[in-house]
């Protein structure tokens, strides 16, 4: 209300003549009308602040409805202005009370950006269709994440688990469970394709789009082998839907007039090697961010070539599969007509390394040239199950590596690799994540085996800019954890170590006077200068349960932080 009441009031016009007296009457009438509108608006805002069940004298709905409140008579511009100050829940509550207010809910000024996280389920489709029908044609920033529900862990219904006896029953139960699991994934993919089509159809003619981001977390791609030859071919046997999705994506790119941010990660065959050619030269020349990550492209084909990259002269951040980032691309990015690249995110996946060669990757001289071109260049590396010998080829000394995330299912990271990272990237490294999901009855691997010093302690000692350290699935000795906390102190903002990864020396366990767990918590908290405790539930760590999504979101914030 202060915003409206603080407007200076005009002085009444002179009334010395008959015309002046008439002007004075009209002025007073306008002032009375204006005061009445302000009183109505004050009551309306009081009603918005009320919540149901608070015991107010009047329900908030009465302040919004009816002729007494005058809500329907307020101009649309004023309603939109009021909406702009309200949080989303209050905005929806207000719009539900009056048809005139509902009409103003989806004004373009109120929805400059739209960020949607969808479960791949039938219930989401009508909601998505409604929202995209209202906002898809004008929204400037659109980020959509598709999250598949955990169909792999639910098992079957009653009767699937071998409740009867005998060998034949057991075999039949296994076959039935596999069949049910297959039908679940077929349903997931069918709905997924429908949701993607809904999004793309709604924005095909949106020429205001500036940021467009798509993320599809369909884990069946990595867990069940080649999707194209199994599930996807059964859901879309003639390939019509996939072709329609690819054509719509290219149509969006060709129609864009203001696009500066394009990001597509872990989607199913949406981006093709010819998709970027749909971008006009003026748009490609002004693009600031481009990320094309693990889009399930069969064979050894790539989504972007060095020749195509030459058009993106204004690129400030780039995210690609590591095997697609070649020495020729590094040379293109160092050309004088390109602005300095400031953020580079690279995904190293064992599936890509097996299909594509590492022979074309940039050498140390290329990395030196990139660093000379841009002193602020920083690199984010996400590594899935890469052997130590391949990592030794990848980790060139001149990479300005700021973040590294290891996620292992088969191949563990060695202590030698951790030691190499701490020596080569001590001036840059801020984030270090070690995740291991291997099932090994012999226990977690110990990085400090046959070493005088623990590599993790050396990492904390050498890397003075380290702010985040997360570990699961590797043995971390309690005394080493205390040393890490003391070395980095309050500069280490995040220290996440799972309880099952922590081990104690026999001497610490033998001391009857001290509780080793409580002592560890106290010493680490003292070293960090803040309260600390181990992660008790590994399922609460999204970096472990959803590594793809975690990397994609971190890549987005990493690229925006320029």
Swiss-Prot record:
Metabolic or biological pathway: Protein modification; protein ubiquitination
Residue ranges of domain F-box in the record: 68-114
SMART domains: FBOX
Pfam families with a match to the protein in the record: F-box-like
Sequence ranges of Gly residues compositional bias: 155-173
InterPro entries listed in its UniProt record: F-box-like_dom_sf, F-box_dom, LRR_dom_sf
Metal-binding as UniProt keyword: no
GO BP annotation list: protein ubiquitination
Highest taxon in the source lineage: Eukaryota
Keyword Glycosyltransferase among UniProt keywords: no
SUPFAM superfamilies: F-box domain
Keywords: Ubl conjugation pathway
Region span, Disordered: 155-176
Known function: Substrate recognition component of a SCF (SKP1-CUL1-F-box protein) E3 ubiquitin-protein ligase complex which mediates the ubiquitination and subsequent proteasomal degradation of target proteins. Probably recognizes and binds to phosphorylated target proteins. Recognizes YBX1.
Quaternary state and interactors: Part of the SCF (SKP1-CUL1-F-box) E3 ubiquitin-protein ligase complex SCF(FBXO33) formed of CUL1, SKP1, RBX1 and FBXO33. Interacts via its N-terminus with YBX1 CSD domain. Directly interacts with SKP1 and CUL1.
The name this protein goes by in its record: F-box only protein 33
The species this protein was found in: Mus musculus
Taxonomic lineage of the native organism: Eukaryota, Metazoa, Chordata, Craniata, Vertebrata
Name of the gene encoding the protein in the UniProt record: Fbxo33
């Amino acid at each position: 209300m202060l915003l409206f009441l603080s407007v200076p009031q005009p002085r009444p016009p002179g009334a010395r003549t008959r015309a002046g007296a008439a002007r004075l009457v009209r002025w007073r009438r306008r002032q009375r009308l204006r005061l009445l509108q302000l009183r109505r608006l004050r009551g309306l805002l009081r009603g918005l602040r009320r919540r149901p069940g608070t015991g107010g004298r009047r329900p908030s709905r009465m302040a919004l409805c009816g002729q007494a409140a005058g809500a329907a008579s307020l101009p649309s511009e004023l309603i939109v202005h009021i909406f702009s100050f309200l949080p989303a829940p209050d905005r929806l509550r207000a719009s539900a009370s009056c048809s005139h207010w509902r009409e103003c809910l989806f004004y373009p000024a109120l929805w400059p950006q739209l960020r949607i996280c969808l479960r791949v389920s039938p219930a989401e489709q009508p909601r998505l269709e409604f929202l995209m029908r209202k906002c898809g044609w004008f929204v400037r920033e659109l980020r959509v994440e598709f999250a598949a529900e955990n169909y792999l862990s639910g098992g079957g219904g009653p009767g699937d688990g071998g409740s009867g006896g005998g060998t034949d029953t057991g075999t039949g139960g296994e076959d039935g469970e596999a069949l049910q699991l297959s039908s679940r994934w077929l349903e997931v993919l069918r709905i997924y394709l429908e949701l993607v089509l809904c999004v793309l159809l709604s924005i095909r003619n949106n020429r205001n789009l500036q940021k467009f981001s798509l993320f599809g977390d369909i884990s069946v791609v990595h867990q069940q082998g080649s999707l194209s030859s199994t599930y996807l071919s059964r859901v879309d046997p003639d390939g019509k839907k996939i072709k329609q999705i690819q054509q719509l994506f290219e149509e969006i790119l060709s129609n864009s007039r203001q696009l500066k941010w394009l990001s597509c990660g872990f989607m199913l065959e949406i981006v093709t090697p010819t998709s970027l050619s749909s971008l006009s030269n003026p748009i490609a020349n002004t693009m600031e961010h481009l990320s094309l990550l693990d889009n399930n492209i069969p064979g050894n084909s790539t989504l972007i070539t060095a020749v195509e990259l030459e058009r993106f002269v204004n690129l400030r951040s780039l995210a690609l599969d590591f095997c697609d980032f070649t020495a020729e691309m590094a040379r293109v990015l160092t050309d004088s007509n390109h602005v300095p690249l400031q953020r580079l995110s690279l995904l190293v996946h064992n599936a890509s390394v097996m299909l594509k060669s590492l022979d074309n990757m940039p050498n140390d001289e290329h990395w030196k040239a990139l660093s000379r071109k841009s002193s602020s260049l920083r690199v984010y590396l996400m590594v899935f199950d890469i052997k130590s010998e391949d990592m030794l080829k990848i980790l060139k000394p001149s990479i300005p590596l700021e973040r590294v995330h290891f996620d292992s299912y088969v191949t563990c990271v060695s202590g030698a690799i951790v030691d190499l990272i701490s020596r080569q990237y001590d001036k840059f490294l801020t984030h270090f994540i070690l995740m291991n999901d291997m099932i090994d009855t012999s226990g977690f691997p110990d990085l400090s085996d046959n070493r005088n010093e623990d590599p993790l302690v050396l990492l904390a000692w050498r890397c003075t800019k380290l702010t985040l350290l997360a570990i699961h699935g590797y043995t971390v000795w309690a005394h080493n954890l205390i040393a890490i906390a003391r070395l980095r102190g309050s500069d280490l903002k995040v220290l996440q170590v799972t309880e099952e990864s922590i081990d104690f020396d026999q001497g610490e366990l033998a001391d009857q006077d001290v509780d080793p767990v409580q002592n560890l918590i106290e010493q680490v908290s003292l070293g960090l200068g803040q309260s600390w405790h181990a992660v008790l539930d590994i399922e609460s760590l999204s970096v472990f349960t959803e590594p793809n999504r975690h990397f994609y979101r971190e890549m987005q914030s990493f690229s925006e932080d320029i």
